[in-house]
């Protein structure tokens, strides 16, 4: 049985005395990466490892330097009684560009073109390895907008929106095509889809977004922007604030959206 497992079972900090620094840092990294943007008090690590705060701070500094060196994100320290440390999953620079180029190459495969001029994307949208990284890239692009909620519409935009919400550590809200009795009173709007030019309905429960909430809209595909405009109207009907719109793929035409 590993030393860390023994510690967790015994609940005693002194059993961690034999744990090497590299083992502590691996465990710290796992705990932080599993909860993006969640503020974890330093005392939590002190109790978990049975170490002094100064030692924990030194370990966290090494973790931060390593993450930044390899462009895997960074650690943000918040001072004060209610402070702590949180992992910010930045994806930018060379790593972000490599990820986007890989996705672009897959989308440009000739056999992806389907009748109607559409691109088959489902295998990419449901690839969690890809969606996790794209979610972190989008989070990095919109981090300065400080959204309170991530909003999408069912169904294909959900996987990407889930990973954006995870990267931000913010609630995900999903607009439906029809209202559900189990969700209480709702607001519904009609909008014109850009892909087919048909009038469709989307609905959102009134409890989903409070007034003055900052909302980031996420979707998988944009042609004329009808769906995004519909989502924006829903947010405005609920007295929310749209801080941005992020999509995985947007057609060149029509322009503007």
Mark where each language-model region is.
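PRPP-associated nucleotide enzymes
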Residues: 3-217, 224-257
């Amino acid at each position: 049985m590993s030393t860390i497992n023994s510690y967790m079972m015994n609940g005693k900090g002194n059993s961690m005395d034999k744990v090497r620094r590299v083992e502590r840092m691996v465990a710290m990294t796992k705990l932080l990466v599993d909860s993006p943007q969640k503020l974890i008090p330093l005392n939590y690590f002190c109790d978990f490892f049975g170490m002094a705060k100064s030692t924990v701070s030194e370990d966290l500094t090494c973790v931060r330097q390593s993450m930044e060196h390899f462009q895997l994100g960074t650690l943000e320290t918040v001072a004060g009684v209610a402070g702590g440390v949180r992992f910010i999953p930045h994806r930018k620079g060379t790593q972000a560009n490599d990820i986007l180029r890989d996705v672009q190459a897959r989308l440009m495969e000739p056999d992806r073109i389907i009748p109607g001029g559409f691109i088959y994307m489902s295998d990419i949208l449901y690839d969690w390895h890809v969606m996790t990284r794209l979610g972190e890239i989008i989070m990095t692009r919109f981090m300065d907008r400080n959204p309170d909620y991530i909003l999408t519409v069912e169904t294909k935009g959900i996987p990407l929106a889930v990973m954006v919400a995870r990267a931000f550590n913010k609630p995900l809200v999903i607009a439906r095509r029809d209202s559900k009795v189990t969700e209480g009173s709702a607001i519904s709007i009609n909008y014109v889809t850009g892909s087919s030019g048909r009038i469709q309905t989307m609905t959102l429960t009134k409890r989903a977004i409070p007034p003055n909430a900052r909302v980031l809209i996420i979707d998988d595909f944009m042609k004329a922007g009808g769906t995004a405009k519909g989502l924006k109207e829903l947010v405005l009907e609920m007295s929310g604030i749209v801080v941005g719109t992020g999509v995985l793929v947007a057609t060149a035409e029509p322009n503007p959206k």
